[in-house]
Amino acid sequence: MKSSGTATQSAPCLPRYYGEVMGVLSDCSDSSEVLTGMRLARAAIGRGELIVMPTDTVYGIAADAFSPDAVRALVAAKGRTLAAPPPVLVPGIQTLDALAENVPDAVRALVAEFWPGPLTVIVPARSSLNWDLGETRGTVALRMPDDQIALELLNETGPLACSSANLTGQPP
């Protein structure tokens, strides 16, 4: 995957645009850059563009989960097809009921214990939602990252389709 700009290994970055659009790197470990980085990330998501954002496990490529074009761009950036739909990051447990239906009590107990954190749950997607994540077979993979910057961004943008910032088959 080609990217414009350079990455730093030591600090989370928001946003980092992949492809030929533009390269903007904000070091969100520097408090003077957080507001600018968040503003740029929100704007990029609003335009249907991809960003690279920190999560609690790896950097992720993220897109508006409700924008079919943005989700297709995310899947293409990963070198995948819609046969492998991306998980969706959420800002809080309350979003579980907004995006899923018929959530088993066992899943509710798991998210109560392990969210925020590196737990992804696959649950029945709410049938009334107007989104296209790919071949989900009526399910959605949801995760609430344990990263303050990610959660702040998710609170402002809403759910984001997100996958690790690497090509499929390559290390993150």
PLM feature spans:
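Low-acidity, Ser/Thr- and Arg-rich intrinsically disordered low-complexity segments
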Residues: K2-S4, S10
